[in-house]
Amino acid sequence: NDCDMYKILKKLGKCGCFAGVHCENAGVIDALIAEAKKEGRLGPENHPLVRPDTMEAEAVHRLLVIAKEADAPVMVVHLTNKKAFEEVMRARANGQEVYAETCPQYLEFTCDVYKREDGRNFVCSPPMKGQESQDALWKAIKNGMIDTVATDHCPFQSYEKDWGKDDFTKIPNGCPGVENLYPYMLDAANSGKITFERAVELCSTNVAKIFGCDNKGSISVGKDADIVIYDKDKDFTISVDNMHSDLDHTIWEGKQLHGYPIRTYLRGNVVYDNGDFVGTPGLGEYVKRSPRKH
């Protein structure tokens, strides 16, 4: 509730932290879901209808008003639509410290996917939105107005998605994405949609800066040697058959990429090489973060 949100944001601000917040108006959405069920509208094509742009934008607006009163920075996670983004820009214009994140699924797919036979596989919240919103997100990315691109990775197997084949409200919400984030954003750079520098900022540099990961985010003296080698001429088609995640489907099936990562170094150690994980179990380390200054 708003009272708790105010208290939490204020406490986090004083501690040098900030909250990443999922923004949708749950109360109105519950009412819209009840109306849809009463009217017998139970297919996945109704998922974006009961979670409209306005209910995300309203929640973003309310969050930012409360954050301003609490004098606290905040991040709006998995931003999906133009109206919600306009609320972020309005708050920034008033001097607020607001970060915005979006995800590849919102940059690639629109709400039309819910009309497909496999539409239930795309059910996530917030849902994919219309073409106008997708265009606005790409424009914001190009202009540097969106800070990071993440995945909201939350996969389910087909049998789990099938729980809602007769009632979209029973479909577990979430899609896979973590394995395809860098390939997708680097493909956008390779095709000229954005620059390679911008892709790196969105997926690495900005993330490290915002979250205080001082040893990460760039190739420079004193930083960890976390490096991706990218072959811009290698063609790759995403399929569940060539993914490393233990899944029986992916919403990215058949997506063609021009260019693909061929090697990954973690602190100077090769952990991925031409499609194979070659890292040693236990090589990972705790990443200490620095407190923020607001």
Predicted regions and their residues:
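C-terminal cap of metal-dependent C-N hydrolases
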Residues: 163, 167, 221-287
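Thr-Gly-centered strand-to-loop micro-motif
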Residues: 124-127, 151, 267, 273
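His/Asp/Glu-enriched, well-ordered alpha-helical/loop segment
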Residues: 41-71, 121, 143, 147-149, ...
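Anionic group-transfer/hydrolysis microenvironments
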Residues: 24, 80, 103, 154, ...
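Short acidic-hydrophobic sequence patches enriched in Asp/Glu that either
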Residues: 4, 177, 181, 244
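Glycine/Thr-rich phosphate-binding loops of Rossmann-like dinucleotide-binding domains
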Residues: 29, 85, 108, 157-159, ...
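Short, solvent-exposed cationic patches
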Residues: 286-294
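Histidine/acidic residue-rich metal-binding segments in metalloenzymes
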Residues: 1-149
